[in-house]
């Protein structure tokens, strides 16, 4: 499958201006560069950002798996037992479809190249048949691409169902092509950029834009300075060219003078050459005598070398015997170490089994503890509800008692007022009767009063009963 690789052009670097001294006035403004802004947060907090990052991570994981399918097809014999028959079958079908697509594309390229070469035969029937066959082949490409998409989804579905196979496939990362690896690196770089973008708050984004604007202004000022420096450099270059022309003129004059000097010095050169030849002959005779002496020294050194070799051979034999003895001791120590390590391995396995059993018991105890905690929370909630109900009942009882006392007080006041009114009425009636009957009926009046008192007592008893 073809991968589109996006290349990023390198940043522009301005001309390097060296060896130029500037004399500028010091300004009162601070020239400290603004500090680069970094996000204050290090983790994603919202669900949407986490979902975005999880989707991008899953996409990168799927791309890593898809770019290794061609390597799996080429090494199918070594991976067939590890990945499973279903996955290998799906991979073979996917590779066959990709190969078919590549064959169609190559065929179309060849036919189009043939059409370009034979543009002068457009009116011929065979040319039209060729164009029709090319269009027919192009119409077959979209269904084939759709089949490749479906097969890719099927292979990814099988690999995601089997995490062990996916991890085993990711180990084969050396089989990935350079284009695919660069594409994955671009996706990882995009993930880092998106992660930093999601961590940046609106306030930080505003600060970042302000930071970029400051950098832009500084860059503009620096560009103006660079332009002025380039103008100064051009002026300096012109001055230097003028000086170079002057120096070239001086050099030419010196060359002419030197040529004249060489003509005059040829005779002196011949004389010095003859003297040098004489000196060379004398040195040659002296060197021959020196060579003979050196050869005698070489013979002496060779005899000494032979004697040293014999001595070193005897020492080498003794060292070899010592080495053999040390090697046997090392082998014995290695065997002893292997026995001790096997015993410790058995002991470690037993302790591992005991650790696993205790871990299972700990899990059971944790489950029981969680159940007891839930029951305790339920009981605590029920107690709180009952306490609230009891408090409400007590408050209701207090309200009822207060209402009863108030009703009793009102009823007592009503009875007292009614008794007082009845007494006043009876007294008024007695006075009227005394005036009519006269003084002779005082005894009857006394009896009437006694009867009135008896009635009042009866009413008092009835009032008490009502209370």
Curated annotation (Swiss-Prot):
PANTHER family: DYNEIN REGULATORY COMPLEX PROTEIN 10, IQ DOMAIN-CONTAINING PROTEIN D. GO terms for cellular component: ciliary basal body; cytoplasm; motile cilium. The keyword Cytoplasm applies. InterPro entries: DRC10 (IPR042815), IQ_motif_EF-hand-BS (IPR000048). Residues 458-467 have a biased composition (Basic residues). It comes from Sus scrofa. This is Dynein regulatory complex protein 10. Its main location: cytoplasm. CDD domains: IQCD (cd23767). Residues 400-429 form the IQ domain. The keyword Coiled coil applies. Belongs to the DRC10 family. Residues 334-382 form a coiled coil. The gene is IQCD. Residues 431-457 have a biased composition (Basic and acidic residues). It holds the Pfam family IQ. Component of the nexin-dynein regulatory complex (N-DRC). Interacts with CFAP52. Residues 422-467 are annotated as: Disordered. Gene3D superfamilies: 1.20.5.190. It is found in: Cytoplasm, Cytoskeleton, Flagellum axoneme.
């Amino acid at each position: 499958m073809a991968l589109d690789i996006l290349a990023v052009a390198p940043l522009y670097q301005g001309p390097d201006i060296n060896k130029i001294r500037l004399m500028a006035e010091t300004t009162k403004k601070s020239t400290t560069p603004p500090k680069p802004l970094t996000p204050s947060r290090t983790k994603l907090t919202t669900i949407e950002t986490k979902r975005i990052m999880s989707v991008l991570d899953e996409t990168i994981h799927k791309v890593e798996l898809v770019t290794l399918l061609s390597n799996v097809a080429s090494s199918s014999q070594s991976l067939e037992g590890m990945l499973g028959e279903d996955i290998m079958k799906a991979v073979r079908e996917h590779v066959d479809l990709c190969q078919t697509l590549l064959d169609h594309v190559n065929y179309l390229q060849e036919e189009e190249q043939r059409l370009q070469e034979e543009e002068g035969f457009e009116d011929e029937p065979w040319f039209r048949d060729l164009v029709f066959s090319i269009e027919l082949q192009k119409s077959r490409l979209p269904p084939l691409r759709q089949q490749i998409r479906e097969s890719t989804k099927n292979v990814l579905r099988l690999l995601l169902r089997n995490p062990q196979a996916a991890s085993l496939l990711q180990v084969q990362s050396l089989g990935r092509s350079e284009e695919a690896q660069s594409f994955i690196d671009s996706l990882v770089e995009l993930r880092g950029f998106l992660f930093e973008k999601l961590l940046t708050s609106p306030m930080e984004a505003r600060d970042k834009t302000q930071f970029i604007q400051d950098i832009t202004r500084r860059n503009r000022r620096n560009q103006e300075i660079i332009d002025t420096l380039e103008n100064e450099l051009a002026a300096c270059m012109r001055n230097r060219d003028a000086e170079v022309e002057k120096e070239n003129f001086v050099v030419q004059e010196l060359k002419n003078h030197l040529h004249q000097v060489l003509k005059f010095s040829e005779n002196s050169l011949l004389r010095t050459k003859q003297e040098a030849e004489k000196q060379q002959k004398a040195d040659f005779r002296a060197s021959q005598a020196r060579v003979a002496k050196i050869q005698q020294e070489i013979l002496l050194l060779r005899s000494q070398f032979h004697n040293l070799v014999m001595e070193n051979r005897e020492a080498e034999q003794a060292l070899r015997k010592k080495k053999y003895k040390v090697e046997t001791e090392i082998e014995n120590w290695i065997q002893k170490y292997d026995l001790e390590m096997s015993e410790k391995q058995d002991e470690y396995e037993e302790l591992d089994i005991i650790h696993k059993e205790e871990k299972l018991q700990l899990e059971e105890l944790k489950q029981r503890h969680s159940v007891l905690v839930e029951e305790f929370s339920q009981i605590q909630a029920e107690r709180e509800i009952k306490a609230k109900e009891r408090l409400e009942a007590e408050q209701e009882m207090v309200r009822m008692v207060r209402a009863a006392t108030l009703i009793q007080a009102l009823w007592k006041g009503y009875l007292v007022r009614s008794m007082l009114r009845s007494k006043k009425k009876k007294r008024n009636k007695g006075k009227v009767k005394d005036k009519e009957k006269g003084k002779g009926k005082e005894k009857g009046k006394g009896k009437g009063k006694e009867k009135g008192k008896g009635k009042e007592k009866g009413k008092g008893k009835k009032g008490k009963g009502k209370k």
